[in-house]
Swiss-Prot record:
Keywords, alphabetical: Methylation, Ribonucleoprotein, Ribosomal protein, RNA-binding, rRNA-binding, tRNA-binding
Gene: rpsL
Modified residues (3-methylthioaspartic acid): 89
GO cellular component terms given for this protein: small ribosomal subunit
Pfam families documented for this protein: Ribosom_S12_S23
Top-rank taxon: Bacteria
Assigned protein family: Belongs to the universal ribosomal protein uS12 family.
Organism field: Synechococcus sp. (strain CC9311)
Disordered as annotated region, ranges: 104-124
Known function: With S4 and S5 plays an important role in translational accuracy.
Protein name, per record: Small ribosomal subunit protein uS12
Family matches, as InterPro entries: NA-bd_OB-fold, Ribosomal_uS12, Ribosomal_uS12_bac
CDD domains, alphabetized: Ribosomal_S12
Molecular-function GO terms, alphabetical: rRNA binding; structural constituent of ribosome; tRNA binding
Length: 124
């Protein structure tokens, strides 16, 4: 605990909030190129093969991004758009790949929450 005299000499410094998605550099999205597309297993107690990609961004960072939805068409050298948002059961995955933009196709036969997966409206 500082004395009043110490506080007069040096005022308290405000804590700066640390960003949860530093690779975006204060942008809503960033473009990048997939360097590796693979599956990863989640932390306990969950069990699955989650689809993830290693992406080299235009900001110079190389990050791991999650590929949401059922099925995808991504491979090495695919150009993708990523957004922030972590995956709770995959350590180190702090970004999501946006479906339906650039080289990423939307999810086929998706009827609900279509805007999140880049799916077009179904033909009546």
């Amino acid at each position: 605990m500082p004395t009043i005299q110490q506080l007069i000499r040096h005022e308290r410094q405000t804590l700066k909030a640390k960003t949860k998605s530093p690779a975006l550099r204060a942008c809503p999205e960033r473009r990048g190129v997939c360097t590796r597309v693979y599956t990863s297993t989640p932390k306990k107690p969950n069990s699955a093969l989650r689809k993830v990609a290693r992406v080299r961004l235009t900001s110079g960072f190389e990050v791991t991004a999650y590929i949401g939805g059922i099925g995808h068409n991504l491979q090495e050298h695919s150009v993708v758009l990523i957004r922030g948002g972590r995956v709770k059961d995959l350590p180190g995955v702090r970004y999501h790949i946006i479906r339906g933009t650039l080289d990423t196709a939307g999810v086929k036969d998706r009827r609900q929450s279509r805007s999140k997966y880049g799916a077009k409206a179904p033909k009546e």
